[in-house]
């Protein structure tokens, strides 16, 4: 169905396999049920553990990761029809651009498909590395520990055969969790990347106006229709971005708060862990957080910049040679582009690289305080 749109094809295929999109079968209830049960055992463990600071930080990271994973699955199911409508919008807009048979647009479509496919595979690769880190962590410990701290009331999970059974269970659900968490992130980033393509297509169309309708040799009616079509396309991009915001903005806010705290804690964990193997595993955890956040913030920032660039492209239409009504239309278009639509964080502020830098600065500040207090 989406084989031609490699930007989102792999992500939808995985989510569809687990029946989180389009299909509805037993796999949906198996993956969500097992993950929810696992979160319950993690919460029980965190409430009763006597582990040291290192263990608490590591297991807090796991707990937040699993909660975020199940939250994404529930959001997909709760807003299932709205996600499908958004994907349908992307599909229709994609083929509309493809059918233009414009060499520039075809080139950027090919490029975004390649980048999207590479990103989806890269994120899954990072996920597999992290899963290996989860599984190898108990092997690097001097005592019996599980990949994820968890406890079933009434059982001693460190006694045989419960330990072996619980270890196998956790290693089996880890790839399942990756397939719930990572494709969702890659899908949302893919939707944002296509928004960038649409902005570039609009800029290209506006720059063609001066070439197709030169001053002194233009049909006023055709020019008016072209400008109106560009304005409508700009509005469709804004509506597309609003649709993404409605589905994701609060989740992005939760992730920012959770991962900021976890990133600070994991950095602190780097200076208190003992052993090279544990150090490598903690670095893998940090890399996964940064890889997920940076991809989102990078493309969300680029989408905002490309929306802003629409104003420059509109100015290059030689609008000052148009009739007065068309000049007003172009001016309104430029004014709207100078207040660029953006992917929002909690419907409060746009997601930009500046925000990502602030996140790192704040995290490092708290890390420095912890280091001075406990170092």
UniProtKB/Swiss-Prot annotation:
Extracellular side: 50-60, 143-176, 273-278, 364-375
GO MF assignments: ionotropic olfactory receptor activity; odorant binding; olfactory receptor activity
Lipid bilayer topology: Multi-pass membrane protein
Pfam family membership, one: 7tm_6
Tissue-level expression: Expressed in olfactory sensory neurons in the antenna.
GO biological process: detection of chemical stimulus involved in sensory perception of smell; sensory perception of smell; signal transduction
Main location: membrane
Subunit composition and interactions: Interacts with Orco. Complexes exist early in the endomembrane system in olfactory sensory neurons (OSNs), coupling these complexes to the conserved ciliary trafficking pathway.
Note in the entry: The atypical heteromeric and topological design of the odorant receptors appears to be an insect-specific solution for odor recognition, making the OR/Orco complex an attractive target for the development of highly selective insect repellents to disrupt olfactory-mediated host-seeking behaviors of insect disease vectors. Odor-evoked OR currents are independent of known G-protein-coupled second messenger pathways.
Name of the protein: Odorant receptor 49b
Species this chain originates from: Drosophila melanogaster
């Amino acid at each position: 169905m989406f084989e031609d749109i490699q930007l989102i094809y792999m992500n939808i295929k995985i989510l569809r396999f687990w029946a989180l999109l389009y299909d509805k079968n037993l796999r949906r209830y198996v993956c969500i049920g097992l993950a929810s049960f696992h979160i319950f055992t993690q919460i029980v463990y965190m409430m009763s553990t006597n582990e040291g600071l290192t263990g608490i930080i590591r297991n807090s990271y796991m707990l937040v990761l699993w909660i975020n994973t199940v939250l994404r699955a529930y959001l997909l199911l709760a807003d299932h029809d709205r996600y499908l409508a958004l994907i349908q919008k992307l599909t229709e807009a994609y083929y509309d651009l493809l059918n233009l048979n414009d060499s520039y647009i075809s080139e950027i479509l090919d490029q975004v498909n390649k980048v999207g496919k590479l990103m989806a595979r890269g994120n899954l690769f990072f996920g597999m590395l992290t899963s290996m880190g989860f599984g190898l962590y108990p092997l690097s410990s001097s005592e019996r520990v599980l990949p994820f701290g968890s406890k079933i009331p009434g059982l001693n999970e460190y006694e045989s055969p419960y330990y072996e059974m619980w270890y196998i269970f956790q290693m089996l659900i880890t790839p399942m969790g990756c397939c719930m968490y990572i494709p969702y992130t890659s899908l949302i980033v893919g939707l944002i990347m296509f928004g960038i393509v649409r902005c570039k297509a609009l800029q290209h169309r506006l720059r063609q106006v001066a070439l197709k309708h030169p001053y002194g040799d233009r049909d006023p009616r055709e020019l008016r229709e072209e400008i109106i079509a560009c304005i409508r396309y700009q509005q469709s991009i804004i509506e597309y971005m609003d649709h993404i915001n409605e589905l994701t903005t609060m989740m992005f806010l939760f992730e920012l708060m959770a991962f900021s705290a976890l990133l600070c804690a994991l950095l602190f964990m780097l200076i208190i862990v003992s052993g090279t193997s544990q150090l490598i595993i903690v670095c893998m955890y940090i890399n996964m957080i940064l890889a997920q956040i940076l991809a989102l913030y990078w493309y969300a920032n680029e989408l905002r910049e490309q929306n802003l660039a629409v104003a420059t492209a509109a100015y290059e239409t030689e609008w000052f040679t148009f009739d007065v009504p068309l000049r007003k239309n172009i001016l309104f278009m430029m004014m709207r582009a100078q207040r660029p639509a953006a992917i929002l964080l909690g419907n409060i502020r746009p997601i930009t690289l500046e925000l990502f830098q602030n996140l790192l600065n704040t995290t490092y500040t708290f890390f420095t305080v912890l280091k001075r207090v406990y170092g």
